[in-house]
Each structure stands twice: as structure tokens, then as C-alpha cells.
Amino acid sequence: FGVPEGATVLLVFGGSLGAHHLNEAVCSLKDELLARPGLVIVHSTGADDEAFVRQTLSLTDEQAARWQVMPYISNMGEALAAADLVVSRAGASSIAEIAALAAPSILVPYPHATADHQTTNAHYLVDAGAALLVPDAELDGASFSSALTGLLDEPERRAAMREAARG
């Protein structure tokens, strides 16, 4: 991913189909995120949302070096291994990959999933202390922003979450 040594990597993805509301919420934090020296965002938008995210962000070349926008990540294992923090939906495959690589995460379950199974999935990591859960309805509010900035500001907390994920 061409991430500079020592950078803090925020990985954002919505699963194989992407997640428009999640993309909107992360894009709304552009100025706040890019104001953090050493932060690199790797943002997998889903194919349907790539143009929307690129247009919404309107990144300069300098900003684009720190905010990598792509429709899909073919080597998710490599991306998760590089990530200091993950923001993701909570589909079964996403949870399995996040857990396998012990990546600290903020999980935003898709609210219309059958029988709310993504919330159930998320609790696997949340209950272990390896993730935070932010309901989709709270993406536009202070809880998502404060959860994200709080974890970016606390490397010790992320390290504890990583250890919790390892069991």
C-alpha cells in the first residue's frame, strides 16, 4: 500500500459491496483526519461508491498520498496486517478477517441485515474487548467521531484491543 514507515494506518471498508452511509460518515471527517500528521487512510469504497467518495473528498495530490481511495482491496490480509485501526461493517467474512489479524476496530453493523446478524457478529469482537460498536444511526453524530478520534489518540488502547483479539 506504499504506507510510510511509522505512519498510523486507518483502514476503512464496507465489505465486498461497500457501504454508502459509512463512506459518507468517514468523508465528513476529512479535515479532521487529514489534520493528523502521520495518519494514512486506506479507504475501500466498494465499486458503486468510488466516484462518489473521490468527488466528495476532492483530494489534492498531497492529500491523495495520505488518503488512498480504491473500489476494492484484493489482498485484505495485507491491508489488515498494516492497519492500526479498522472501521468496517460487521459481515461474517469481515469479522473473521479482522479477528484473524487481531486488528483493533470500530464496527458499524448494517442495520438492514437479516435478523440483525451483523450486530450479533460485531459482539463477538466487542464482548472480547477487541472492537467498539457504533450503530449505523449514530454515524452522523458525535459518537462515531469521538470513537474514531479517541482510538487514534490512544495507541495503548489500540494495543490492548489487539491483545484482546488474540485471546
Which residues does each PLM region occupy?
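A short, well-ordered alpha-helix in the C-terminal region of glycosyltransferases
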Residues: R157-G167
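Donor-nucleotide binding loops and adjacent catalytic segments primarily
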Residues: V3-S88, T119-H123, D127, V134-F144
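Residue-level detector of anion-binding/catalytic polar loops
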Residues: P104, A130-A131
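A donor-sugar binding/catalytic signature common to diverse glycosyltransferases
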Residues: M76-Q118
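A short helix/loop element that forms part of the nucleotide-sugar donor recognition site in Leloir-type
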Residues: F1-G2, R157
